[in-house]
From Swiss-Prot:
This is Agglutinin isolectin 3. Homodimer, u-shaped. Residues 172-186 form a propeptide. The modification Pyrrolidone carboxylic acid is found at residue 1. SMART domains: ChtBD1.
Length: 186
């Protein structure tokens, strides 16, 4: 199931952002330019740039006044939320898992997108970057991950959008995450 304009106006669960392409997640690909609903940066300004407003859902307020997770929000210059000292997952939090099968970044924050699910991802729906698809003998990805048009496994628009070869293409994986959220919640 898609979100936003592509999903008949549907909103993402847990205040995740709906990207310009109609997929749910967190990070720049989802909450930045073109974000349709959820914790969009354009609509969720914070800190000194927004009269001291705080971010919803315990997100960090970056030095530039945008809400989100990861080093660019919770690191140097962070104005509010779980700034560096309040780690949420992974080895920085005693092996704690993220809710809803979100990825735990190398910095110990929960979210979706390459900054969370890519290199250094500790747990959750991490991108495996294993070869798949027609150039890998028809290999499919595990855990219903999407096989991108370039032949790598992962989730998000870059994997499950246009050209997706197999797995949870067109946002089916995001729907599965939302469906299983009660099983994975803290």
């Amino acid at each position: 199931q898609r979100c936003g304009e592509q999903g008949s106006g549907m909103e993402c669960p847990n205040n995740l952002c709906c990207s310009q392409y109609g997929y749910c997640g967190m990070g720049g690909d989802y909450c930045g330019k073109g974000c349709q609903n959820g914790a969009c940066w354009t609509s969720k300004r914070c800190g000194s740039q927004a009269g001291g407003k705080t971010c919803p859902n315990n997100h960090c307020c970056s030095q530039y006044g945008h809400c989100g997770f990861g080093a660019e929000y919770c690191g140097a210059g962070c104005q509010g939320g779980p700034c560096r000292a309040d780690i949420k997952c992974g080895s920085q939090a005693g092996g704690k898992l993220c809710p809803n099968n979100l990825c735990c970044s190398q910095w110990g924050y929960c979210g979706l997108g390459s900054e969370f699910c890519g290199e250094g991802c500790q747990n959750g729906a991490c991108s495996t970057d294993k070869p798949c698809g027609k150039d890998a003998g028809g290999r499919v990805c595990t855990n219903n991950y999407c096989c991108s048009k370039w032949g790598s496994c992962g989730i998000g628009p870059g994997y499950c959008g246009a050209g997706c070869q197999s797995g949870g293409c067109d946002g089916v994986f995001a729907e599965a995450i939302a469906t299983n959220s009660t099983l994975l919640a803290e």
